[in-house]
From Swiss-Prot:
Any GO molecular function: rRNA binding
SUPFAM superfamilies linked to this entry: Ribosomal protein L22
Protein name stated in the entry: Large ribosomal subunit protein uL22
Keyword line: Ribonucleoprotein, Ribosomal protein, RNA-binding, rRNA-binding
InterPro entries: Ribosomal_uL22 (IPR001063), Ribosomal_uL22_bac/chlpt-type (IPR005727), Ribosomal_uL22_bac/org-type (IPR047867), Ribosomal_uL22_CS (IPR018260), Ribosomal_uL22_sf (IPR036394)
Assembly behavior: Part of the 50S ribosomal subunit.
UniProt function note: This protein binds specifically to 23S rRNA; its binding is stimulated by other ribosomal proteins, e.g. L4, L17, and L20. It is important during the early stages of 50S assembly. It makes multiple contacts with different domains of the 23S rRNA in the assembled 50S subunit and ribosome. The globular domain of the protein is located near the polypeptide exit tunnel on the outside of the subunit, while an extended beta-hairpin is found that lines the wall of the exit tunnel in the center of the 70S ribosome.
Family in the record: Belongs to the universal ribosomal protein uL22 family.
Any one GO CC term of the record: cytosolic large ribosomal subunit
Taxonomic superkingdom: Bacteria
Length: 114
């Protein structure tokens, strides 16, 4: 049977826009995990903190579940899909209202051995 060389972690229905999450994920894709964590620590963005948690979870999954070495891991996949949108309304002039879409993301990070 083939040996497992990757581990995955997901955060579902996170209250951050997928578009903004993708900007951060593009910075870490393909990097080794130590560099990716350093990049996320110094990224001044709400999504960066959430993505850092997901990345640390993926690293822990790799170490504990599959016995992989942290030093050999790279971020092989990192993507954000759209979650459910919470729809709200802001009151406007003359009794009208404007819609507000509070978007959510499903963030997935996969780490693999190089």
């Amino acid at each position: 049977m083939a040996e497992i060389t990757s581990a995955k972690a997901m955060a579902r229905t996170v209250r951050v826009s997928p578009r903004k999450s993708r900007l951060v994920l593009d910075n870490i894709r393909g990097k080794n995990v130590a560099d990716a964590i350093a990049i996320l620590k110094f990224t001044p963005n709400k999504a960066a903190g959430i993505i850092e948690k997901v990345l640390n979870s993926a690293i822990a999954n790799a170490e504990n579940n599959f016995g992989l070495e942290k030093a050999n891991l790279v971020v092989s996949e990192a993507f954000a899909n759209e979650g459910p949108t919470m729809k709200r309304f802001r009151p406007r002039a003359k009794g009208s209202a404007s819609p507000i879409n509070k978007r959510t993301s499903h963030i997935t990070v996969v780490v693999a051995e190089k």
